[in-house]
Amino acid sequence: MTTQVPPHSVQVHTTTTHRYEAGVVPPGARFETSYEAGVKAASIYHSERGPTTSQVLAVLAGLPVGGILLLLAGLTLAGTLTGLAVATPLFVLFSPVLVPATVAIGLAVAGFLTSGAFGLTALSSFSWILNYIRETQPASENLAAAAKHHLAEAAEYVGQKTKEVGQKTKEVGQDIQSKAQDTREAAARDAREAAARDAREAAARDAKVEARDVKRTTVTATTATA
């Protein structure tokens, strides 16, 4: 008697991944046509790229403001050109008065601006110096020593400058004295030369007068003898 072996059951489990051959449509699947896919992609693109609310509000607020500003720019340009056309003949007629007045006003304004700039620069310099001194000083107990040191340096600098100024003043005085002496000597020399020249001219004139008198006397004596 033969023994029968029961058949083995084999279970096959399908995976979640499927591979379909070209042209084979699985049951229950639906493929979109190219037209439907294009329309859907265009609608998605336009929905993503469409203007937002903030952009619409910005356009609605910017267009009136830009138009008003452009209108004001045109009106301002027209008014400026009209005023220039009207003021040019008047400026030509009254230029002898307006030009000096304009120059004077410009110089005054420039003077005020220059004075203010110098004042602000000076105040800024003082503020910077004070801040620099406050930052560079190590501690409060060294302030007195630093101040004494700075005062000593300032006194030494002033003394040196005073000595240099005195030396220069002395040199200038000596130069002036030497120039004055040279001037006096030149004046005395010129006076002596002038006196000698006058004496020579007087002697020559006297000699001419004496010669003329002698000649006249000789002529008179000759006439009397004849």
Swiss-Prot record:
Localisation: Lipid droplet; Membrane
The biased composition feature labelled Basic and acidic residues covers 164-173, 181-216
In residue numbers, the region (Hydrophobic) covers 77-130
- Ranges for the region named Polar are 1-76
Please list the residue ranges covered by the sequence repeats. 159-165, 166-173, 184-191, 192-199, 200-207
Its primary localisation, in coarse terms, equals: other
Q: Show the ranges annotated as biased composition (Low complexity).
A: 217-226
Q: Which domain of life is it from?
A: Eukaryota
For the region 2 X 7 AA tandem repeats, what residue ranges are annotated? 159-173
**Is the keyword Transmembrane helix in the record?**
yes
Role summary? May have a structural role to stabilize the lipid body during desiccation of the seed by preventing coalescence of the oil. Probably interacts with both lipid and phospholipid moieties of lipid bodies. May also provide recognition signals for specific lipase anchorage in lipolysis during seedling growth.
Protein name in UniProt: P24 oleosin isoform A
Look up and give the organism this protein is from: Glycine max
